C-alpha cells in the first residue's frame, strides 16, 4: 500500500481558523516521589462543529488534558503552555472568570452521571438551576427550556421526567440528562470524558448517535475522550492518539482508523474485538503502560513496540509527514502501511 494521499488541511491553516488552539500543553503533578508529567507538550486545534477524539490506554493523559482546559486540576497540579479559546487565553484564568467560561462557553460530561447529579434534587430542579443562574431566566421560562432540551436529547415523556429523582432513571437516561444539562447554555465546546463507559453497547450507540445529531444542530465542537476506537470511527472528525502523556499520532479520523502510521495506533486497532474473527486469538499490546516517574529513555512506547530499533532510545520528533497528519516514530511510514 502506498503512502497516504489524503486531501487534508495543513495544520497551520487548521490553527488559523480554530475555535480552540492548544500549544505545548504540559501538566505536571508534585508527588512525594518526585514530579510526574501527565501531559507532555500536547498540540491540537479544533474548529466549530468538529469532533476531536483523544484516544489512549488508562494513564495516557487524556482526562488530565480535559481537566487542564476546564481548570479542574488537583491542587498539586501545574500547567504550562497555551490554550486559546475564541482567541482568548484560558489557562490559569481567575476562578470567577473560569466559572463564567465553564457555564456559558465550555461544558463537560463526566464518566459516571450518577455521581454528577445531586441525588437529593429532582432532575428538573437541577436543569432549571443552570438557566436561572446563568441565563437569568424566570422559573417558568427555565422549566419550559429544560423540557425542550430533554426533548432534544430524545428523553421520553420529558415533562414527566422533570419531577423525577436521578435514581429513578436508567444509566442511559441519566447520561441523556447530563448531555441536556451540558447543552442548556448552548456552549461552543463540549468535552465528553468517556461518556459511554458505564453503559451497555446498545445504549452506547444511542448516545453516540445523539451527540452526532446535537453537534450538527448546535454547531458545537466536541472533544471526545475515550479508549474505544469504535467510538472514534463513529463520531470523530480528527483523532489524537496519546501514550504516556505524549502525542503518538494525530490526523483525520478516517486516515488514522484505516491507515494508522504509528505502532501504538496499530496495536490499539488490532486489539479491538471483531465479530468476523471467530476462533482467532484476540491480539493485545504486550507489557503495561509505563510508570510516569520512571519513563524509558527515548520513545516511551519502545519497550512494548514490535518495531523498536536502536535509534528509538532517542525521542522521535513529532513531525507533520503529510498535510494535517502528525506522528512521532522513526519507522518509515511505508513499512507500517
Swiss-Prot record:
Q: Name one GO biological process term.
A: oligopeptide import across plasma membrane
The ABC transporter domain, residue ranges? 20-269
So what EC number does this one have?
A: 7.4.2.6
What SMART domains does this protein's entry cite?
A: AAA
Q: Name one Pfam family in it.
A: ABC_tran
Kindly list the positions annotated as binding ATP: 56-63
Molecular function GO terms recorded: ATP binding; ATP hydrolysis activity; peptidoglycan peptide transmembrane transporter activity
**Localisation:** Cell inner membrane
Checking Gene3D superfamilies in the record gives: P-loop containing nucleotide triphosphate hydrolases
**InterPro entries referenced in this protein's UniProt entry, alphabetically:** AAA+_ATPase, ABC_Ni/Peptide_Import, ABC_transporter-like_ATP-bd, ABC_transporter-like_CS, Oligopep_ABC_C, P-loop_NTPase
Q: State if Transport is listed as a keyword.
A: yes
What UniProt keywords apply to this chain's record, in alphabetical order?
Answer: ATP-binding, Cell inner membrane, Cell membrane, Membrane, Nucleotide-binding, Peptide transport, Protein transport, Translocase, Transport
Which reaction is catalysed here?
a [peptide](out) + ATP + H2O = a [peptide](in) + ADP + phosphate + H(+); L-alanyl-gamma-D-glutamyl-meso-2,6-diaminopimelate(out) + ATP + H2O = L-alanyl-gamma-D-glutamyl-meso-2,6-diaminopimelate(in) + ADP + phosphate + H(+)
Major enzyme class: translocase
The answer to whether keyword Glycoprotein applies is no
Taken from the UniProt entry, a GO cellular component term is: membrane
Its membrane topology is listed as: Peripheral membrane protein
Q: What does this protein do?
A: Part of the ABC transporter complex OppABCDF involved in the uptake of oligopeptides and of the ABC transporter complex MppA-OppBCDF involved in the uptake of the cell wall murein tripeptide L-alanyl-gamma-D-glutamyl-meso-diaminopimelate. Probably responsible for energy coupling to the transport system. Plays an important nutritional role and is involved in the recycling of cell wall peptides.
NCBIfam families referenced in this protein's UniProt entry, alphabetically: oligo_HPY, PRK09473.1
Record note on quaternary structure: The complex is composed of two ATP-binding proteins (OppD and OppF), two transmembrane proteins (OppB and OppC) and a solute-binding protein (OppA or MppA).
Regarding protein family, the annotation reads: Belongs to the ABC transporter superfamily.
What's this protein's name? Oligopeptide transport ATP-binding protein OppD
Amino acid at each position: 500500500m502506498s503512502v497516504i494521499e489524503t486531501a487534508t488541511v495543513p495544520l497551520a491553516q487548521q490553527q488559523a481558523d480554530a475555535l480552540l488552539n492548544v500549544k505545548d500543553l504540559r501538566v505536571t503533578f508534585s508527588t512525594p516521589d518526585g514530579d510526574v508529567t501527565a501531559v507532555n507538550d500536547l498540540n491540537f486545534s479544533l474548529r466549530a462543529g468538529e469532533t476531536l477524539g483523544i484516544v489512549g490506554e488508562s494513564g495516557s493523559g487524556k482526562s488530565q488534558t480535559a481537566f487542564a482546559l476546564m481548570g479542574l486540576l488537583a491542587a498539586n497540579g501545574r500547567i504550562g503552555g497555551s490554550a486559546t479559546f475564541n482567541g482568548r487565553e484560558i489557562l490559569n484564568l481567575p476562578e470567577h472568570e473560569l466559572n463564567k467560561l465553564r457555564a456559558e462557553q465550555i461544558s463537560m460530561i463526566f464518566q459516571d452521571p450518577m455521581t454528577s447529579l445531586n441525588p437529593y434534587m429532582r432532575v428538573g430542579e437541577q436543569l432549571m438551576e443552570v438557566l436561572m443562574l446563568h441565563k437569568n431566566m424566570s422559573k417558568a421560562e427555565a422549566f419550559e427550556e429544560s423540557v425542550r432540551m430533554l426533548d432534544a436529547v430524545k428523553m421520553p415523556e420529558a415533562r414527566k421526567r422533570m419531577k423525577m429523582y436521578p435514581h429513578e432513571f436508567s444509566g442511559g437516561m441519566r447520561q441523556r440528562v447530563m448531555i441536556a444539562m451540558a447543552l442548556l447554555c448552548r456552549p461552543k465546546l463540549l468535552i465528553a470524558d468517556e461518556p459511554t463507559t458505564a453503559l451497555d453497547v446498545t445504549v452506547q450507540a444511542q448516545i453516540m448517535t445523539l451527540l452526532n445529531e446535537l453537534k450538527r444542530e448546535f454547531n458545537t465542537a466536541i472533544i471526545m475522550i475515550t479508549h474505544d476506537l469504535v467510538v472514534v470511527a463513529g463520531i470523530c472528525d480528527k483523532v489524537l492518539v496519546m501514550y504516556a502523556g505524549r502525542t503518538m499520532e494525530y490526523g483525520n479520523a478516517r486516515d488514522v482508523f484505516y491507515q494508522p502510521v504509528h505502532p501504538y495506533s496499530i496495536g490499539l486497532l488490532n486489539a479491538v474485538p471483531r465479530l468476523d474473527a471467530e476462533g482467532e486469538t484476540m491480539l493485545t499490546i504486550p507489557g503495561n503502560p509505563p510508570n510516569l516517574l520512571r519513563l524509558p529513555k527515548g520513545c516511551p512506547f519502545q519497550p512494548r513496540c514490535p518495531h523498536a530499533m536502536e535509534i528509538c532510545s532517542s525521542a522521535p520528533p513529532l513531525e507533520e509527514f503529510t498535510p494535517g497528519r502528525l506522528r512521532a516514530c522513526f519507522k518509515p511510514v511505508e513499512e507500517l502501511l
